[in-house]
């Protein structure tokens, strides 16, 4: 799976009316997540949960979105994907306050960070980008399935992956090592591993839950976000080269 030309998409025209829909977007206070919420809010959903760690930053993002969409119904959802306890609390908040869930967008992520582990002992990128989202999805699946069983439903799980999944270790997912910092493995390979896990997870979800449309989406290599904020400037210069190499050295998944 390599890079390919994208399909022309006009959010104002191509997103349908979302009246009555309930949506969860992780990492919604900045970058892709914030823009996603902005575009969805234009189409009248009943509620959008903005997953974020900081209530202050989320409040700022919500205020800025409402400058463009004054009637946007956006609710802050406190969530730290590096903490299973936080993810469970966030999921319970959704389940206790909403009778339906139409769209789950697992957008939040970190990239090429220094070696570390999550609160629960997983390699930080694998734990944040994959394990946190996998747990959130599992906990919300009963509500997603319930909604999918309703007439004329269109329930979706969108996982933000990346063509950088091709940078994963040549052995694939090193599952015997993910409960450690994996400091001897390059940070780029660890990022690729987390993105490869996103792709595998999405494929399995699609098999197990045919009533739910499950897709893994590569957002593009020239999208302006702060995901690379932890990188040194010299490392940031390598990002375009990594995506170029994906075109020529992609491995199938």
Give the label of every model feature segment.
Residues 180-181, 234-245:
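A short C-terminal helix-loop "cap" of Rossmann-like NAD(P)-dependent dehydrogenase/epimerase domains
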């Amino acid at each position: 799976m390599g890079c390919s030309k994208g399909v022309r998409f006009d959010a104002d025209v191509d997103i349908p009316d979302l009246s009555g829909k309930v949506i969860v977007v992780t990492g919604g206070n900045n970058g892709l997540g914030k823009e996603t919420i902005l575009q969805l809010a234009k189409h009248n959903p009943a509620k959008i949960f903005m997953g974020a760690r900081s209530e202050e930053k989320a409040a700022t993002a919500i205020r800025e979105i409402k400058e463009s969409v004054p009637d946007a119904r956006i609710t802050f959802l406190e969530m730290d994907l590096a903490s299973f306890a936080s993810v469970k609390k966030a999921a319970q908040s959704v389940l206790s306050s909403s009778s339906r869930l139409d769209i789950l967008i697992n957008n939040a992520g970190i990239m090429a960070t220094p070696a570390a582990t999550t609160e629960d002992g997983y390699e930080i990128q694998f734990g944040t980008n994959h394990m946190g989202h996998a747990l959130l999805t599992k906990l919300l699946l009963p509500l997603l399935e319930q909604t999918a069983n309703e007439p004329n439903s269109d329930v979706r799980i969108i996982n933000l992956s990346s063509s950088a999944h091709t940078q994963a270790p040549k052995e694939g997912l090193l599952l015997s090592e993910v409960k450690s910092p994996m400091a001897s493995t390059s940070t780029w390979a660890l990022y690729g591993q987390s993105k490869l896990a996103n792709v595998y997870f999405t494929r399995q979800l699609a098999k197990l839950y045919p009533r739910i449309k499950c897709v893994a989406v590569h957002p593009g290599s020239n999208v302006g976000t702060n995901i690379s904020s932890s990188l040194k400037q010299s490392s940031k210069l390598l990002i375009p080269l990594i995506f170029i190499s994906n075109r020529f050295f992609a491995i199938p998944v």
